[in-house]
A protein has these predicted regions:
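Conserved SF1/SF2 helicase motif Ia
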Residues: 46, 51, 56-95, 177-178
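Conserved phosphate-coupling serine/threonine residues in phosphotransfer and NTP-handling enzymes
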Residues: 49-51, 125, 185-187
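Post-DEXD/H (motif II) to motif III coupling segment of the RecA-like Helicase ATP-binding lobe
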Residues: 140-148, 153-194
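ASCE RecA-like P-loop NTPase motor cores
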Residues: 2-5, 83, 117, 155, ...
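Pre-Walker A (Motif I) flank of P-loop NTPase domains
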Residues: 39-45, 70-72, 118-120, 179-180
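Conserved pre-motif I regulatory segment
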Residues: 2-48
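Conserved nucleic-acid-binding Ia/Ib motif block in the N-terminal RecA-like helicase ATPase lobe
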Residues: 71-128
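Conserved helix/coil segment N-terminal to the catalytic DExD/H
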Residues: 58, 103-148, 156-162
């Protein structure tokens, strides 16, 4: 009698995301995923463009959803980046949607899908996250059920430089309201002491 084949859900998620079975984790990716999924730590990933920061949070999302965690919220600064992330997530079988200024007519449908737990990833801009209506109507339930909060391009939190966005600074208020065991990851290509 042969032994059952053991599968690695993280490797399967990475392969689905990459669209090929021979893909391997880069140094540090699996460790970041394990910190998020197994130890439920807050993680900062600082790596160059193209390293695979999004693979960390998409694989972590897949594993957390397999463990019955709620959806991931990704705070992302650019609509074009959100579109790219949604396409990548969907290739991996991750149900990703967005609420942003370009799809106002879809917000009610997205909110309903979130309420029915039919969304794995919600991408929002920092401005949407801090919108008073979103904070009162959507965020309380999302914060209660959310499996992971991702602050993508976290260098935008800095209050210095050309990339400053005031609503990124307000994310700290949201983080302060979350339980200390709440999974959070931040990704950036650059980081400094600020």
């Amino acid at each position: 009698m042969s032994e059952p084949v053991r599968t690695d859900p993280a490797q399967e998620a990475l392969a689905a995301l990459a669209g090929r079975s021979d893909v391997a984790f880069r140094e540090g990716q699996r460790e970041a995923i394990e910190a998020l999924v197994d130890r439920r730590e807050r993680v900062l990933v600082v790596q160059r463009t193209g390293w695979g920061k999004s693979a960390v949070y998409f694989v972590a999302t897949r594993l957390r959803r397999l463990a019955d965690a709620g959806p991931t919220i990704i705070v992302s600064p650019l609509l074009a980046l959100m579109r790219d992330q949604i396409a990548a997530a969907q290739r991996a079988g991750i149900r990703a949607v967005t609420m942003n200024s370009a799809n106002v007519a879809d917000w009610e449908e997205v909110a309903s899908a979130l309420a029915r737990d039919e969304v794995d990833v919600l991408l929002v801009s920092p401005e949407r996250l801090n919108n008073p209506r979103f904070r009162t109507e959507q965020l309380p339930d999302l914060a209660r059920r959310c499996g992971l909060l991702v602050v993508d391009e976290a260098h935008c939190v800095s209050d210095w430089g050309h990339d400053f966005r005031p609503d990124y600074r307000r994310i700290k208020d949201l983080l302060a309201d979350l339980p200390p065991v709440f999974n959070v990851t931040a990704t950036t290509e650059t980081a400094n002491g600020r």
